[in-house]
Amino acid sequence: MKLLLTIAMILSLLSPFGTKSSGKNPKPDGASTSYEFTYSGTMMYPITFYEVKRDSAGAVRIAYIEHNGTDVVVIPGPEDIFDHIDRAVAQYKLYKLKNSYWPRMEILDGNGWHTRIRFQHNSIYSGGSNARPPQKIYAGIDAINSYIQSVIDASSEADVLLRQDYQEYDR
């Protein structure tokens, strides 16, 4: 048991040196217009899914998957949510995210994530398979997701506009 703990500690200390990355993103041009984050394992449904965008009438909508669920739930979002996203992008310099992250060693199973932030004139895209960017940058994604989750937590069943299986949801 001690040996396993020691190996786990060594691997966690070496993980910053074990990530490869490629691609780059532009600095944001204009205000954000949509946000998407997905964290998935090897299952059919994502572990975490958030999407923030405006509907055809211009109203802000938040789509998410409930914990361990299979349905996408859509609720109204606050009008200032894009201000929060823009501040996090600037504060954490999310435009420094690389397009792709992966481990130096081959891993045949595991978890993947991706995020896309669209702005008026361009977008930031990043994703990874069993690897993440440096924590000081990834903290910006965590900050956005935490804010979205706080809005979701403050909502009620009466706020639900749509509930649909993830496989059928039109993204």
Model-derived regions, located:
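C-terminal segment of classical bacterial N-terminal signal peptides
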Residues: L13-F17
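Short, solvent-exposed loop/hinge segments that bridge or flank secondary-structure elements
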Residues: M43-R54
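Acidic/histidine-rich, surface-exposed loop or edge segments in extracytoplasmic proteins
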Residues: G58-V73
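Charged, amphipathic alpha-helical segments
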Residues: P78-M105
